[in-house]
Amino acid sequence: MATRTQARGAVIELLYAFESGNEEIKKIAPSMLEEKKIKNNQLAFALSLFNGVLEKINEIDALIEPHLKDWDFKRLGSMEKAILRLGAYEIGFTPTQNPIIINECIELGKLYAEPNTPKFLNAILDSLSKKLAQKPLT
């Protein structure tokens, strides 16, 4: 059975495909997840994350942007966007504890992105989680 980390990794891959212009990914996501041995509760978890990010993508991007400092969101790589969007969605819209989310995103960054990406992800998601702790989403 897949772990939540593996489910999140698969969601990152789906979000990456979506960001790269693959609109069909929304329709085939369940079968792609099952091919990766993500089933039952983890399948439901992964689909809820994927669909949640897509449903709130504009709101998520607006949450991330102020924390980028000298970066332009449009210039970020597709993988970085995918990981940030997943992390921001979980921080803002799920009950999972923020340190767990941030750690998972850092680990996914180590697997899927450039060597400096985990530090970047940590800084952005930590800043976002602190802001939302002061002023939660309504």
From Swiss-Prot:
The UniProt record lists the keyword Ubl conjugation: no
GO cellular component, one term: cytosol
GO biological process, one term: transcription antitermination
Name of the protein: Transcription antitermination protein NusB
Organism of provenance: Helicobacter acinonychis (strain Sheeba)
InterPro entries in the record: NusB-like_sf, NusB_fam, NusB_RsmB_TIM44
Role description: Involved in transcription antitermination. Required for transcription of ribosomal RNA (rRNA) genes. Binds specifically to the boxA antiterminator sequence of the ribosomal RNA (rrn) operons.
Transmembrane segments: none
Coiled coil feature spans: none
Molecular function per GO: RNA binding
Matching Pfam families: NusB
Keywords recorded for this protein, A-Z: RNA-binding, Transcription, Transcription antitermination, Transcription regulation
CDD domains per record: Terminator_NusB (cd00619)
Family: Belongs to the NusB family.
Signal sequence, renumbered to the chain: none
